[in-house]
């Protein structure tokens, strides 16, 4: 994680610790200790290429505070079959963010945001018609 704004207490998920992970969960918040004091930071974005090339990754859960997904964040994660989006504030999905994931992948986002997220996940992000965006 990288602190993006100390005053607003926000961080960005930078990169998967291991390219061979099978599942990942981007939490809503993370605790950071500094000088013996624990601080809570909201995870507001997923950096570019955070999970790029994680060929064994099958499942991702995106936390409720994520506002943006960087370009090529999940590119070439060819086994990625399920993305669960818990956030209702997602505003940006970067170019080729899901390019090269499983061709019949399911992206679930909840009933309230289905229409809005259909606009975010498009051909520029790597979304294919064989994929499903569901509630």
Please provide the spans of the model-predicted regions.
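GGW-centered surface loops in extracellular recognition modules
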Residues: 1-17, 121, 126
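Structural signature of tandem-repeat unit edges
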Residues: 3-8, 19-45, 54-68, 78-92, ...
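A short acidic, amphipathic alpha-helical/loop segment
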Residues: 96-97, 120
């Amino acid at each position: 994680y990288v602190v993006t704004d100390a005053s607003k207490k926000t961080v960005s998920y930078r990169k998967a610790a291991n390219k061979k992970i099978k599942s990942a969960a981007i939490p809503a918040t993370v605790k950071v200790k500094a000088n013996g004091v624990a601080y809570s930071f909201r995870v507001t974005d997923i950096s570019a290429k955070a999970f790029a090339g994680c060929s064994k990754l099958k499942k991702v859960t995106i936390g409720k505070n994520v506002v943006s997904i960087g370009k090529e964040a999940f590119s070439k994660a060819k086994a990625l079959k399920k993305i669960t989006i818990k956030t209702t504030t997602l505003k940006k999905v970067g170019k080729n963010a899901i390019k090269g994931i499983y061709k019949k992948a399911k992206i679930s986002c909840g009933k309230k945001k289905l229409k809005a997220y259909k606009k975010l996940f498009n051909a520029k992000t790597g979304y294919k018609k064989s994929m499903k965006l569901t509630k």
